[in-house]
Amino acid sequence: MADFKATYKLKTNPFRLTPATNPDELVWAGFKDVKEKFEKRIERSIRIPNSTLVLNWGEYGSGKTHAARLFNKKDILKTLAEKAGKTIPYSTVISLPKGKEPIYSIYISIIDKLNIEELRSTFSDIVGDVNTYIDSIGSNLHIQSVLKAVFNSDIQHLDIKKYLYGNMNATYLISLNASGILRSLKDDTDYSSILAGLFSCLTYNKQKYSCVILWIDEFEDIAVLNNANIDKTNNFIREILDNVPNNLLLFLNLTQSALISVEDLGQYVYESVKSRIKERISFDLPNPEIFKEYLRELIGLFREGTDDNPYFPFEENVINSLIIELGNVSLRQFNESLSMLLELSDMDEKCPINTEVFNSYKQEIIWHKD
């Protein structure tokens, strides 16, 4: 088999079928207007002390999860923060839970990613100010004590992590009594209050973190929850936005599916939440011009050496034929076909990929059209 890099002038196959999990492998190609909307929205939240709910809408495979992971990268966020002249955001990506206790699962997903040792180190020089601030938010003395314990280096970080997880038995709980923690966390109100308080502390005066960015991916799964859990999920979103009035940017990634469409949205996302949506970012199906721009940029990012043809190893007429054959489909479907076409050509040592090559594999690479 011929050397892939030398033959196809590509570092590797650029057509991913699923979003990368390694941040170093995440790149953005084309779709400049969508990228710009995210950059501007995040930059506004970095600059301005207000909380915002954004709905990201599109079909399966349109790039919502990819956007969440890319804009969760520290180097991307650092660049946006430097542009705004502020500190970096605290960002995390979770998926909407489908189990019996969605709020507890959301809470655990966020606590899983909370590095208490790192947090304490970051806030060590302003912990006194943070404690004073905690006294000013809400009236629940228990929640205030828990929040202070998170930032208190005198308490073992693993002990407070056990407590937050609910893994501390009554005997060990006694060790936290002196810090004002007299009971375990027990219900959705506790979990929501802890998260709201934590987010507010993280962004105190925008000194250490300019804002908290929370992405909830696969939000369309709300359609498979029972009515009680749909209520709980909507209440959580409403309460977290109300209780973190400053510096929270919440993205909901929603995929149009057989279970949920724009017309069905009101059945699952209540008016109390919809009324808080400040912006909708749509991931539309790409037209031929947008797709070809995306393809040129993507291939350029993976190019090994140079070539006068920006689509190489594909001839442009192959790209045009593929667009006609596939019709109006998602970016993922284009990527699937091009990935398979490239792999088959590599196996059979066919390069460049011209019309003859395309026609020989056409039945295999556009099987999903029917």
Segments predicted by a language model, with ranges:
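A short, basic N-terminal segment
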Residues: 1-54, 74-82, 354-370
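Alpha-helical scaffold elements adjacent to nucleotide-binding pockets in ATP/GTP-utilizing enzyme cores
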Residues: 37, 66-71, 102-113, 233-236, ...
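The catalytic "switch" region of P-loop NTPases
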Residues: 1-14, 18, 173-321
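Alpha-helical repeat scaffolds in large eukaryotic proteins
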Residues: 43-46, 72, 199-203, 224-227, ...
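Active-site-proximal structural scaffolding
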Residues: 49, 230-233, 327, 334
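P-loop NTPase nucleotide-binding core
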Residues: 47-208, 331, 345-354, 359-369
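C-terminal alpha-helical "lid" subdomain
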Residues: 289-293, 298-370
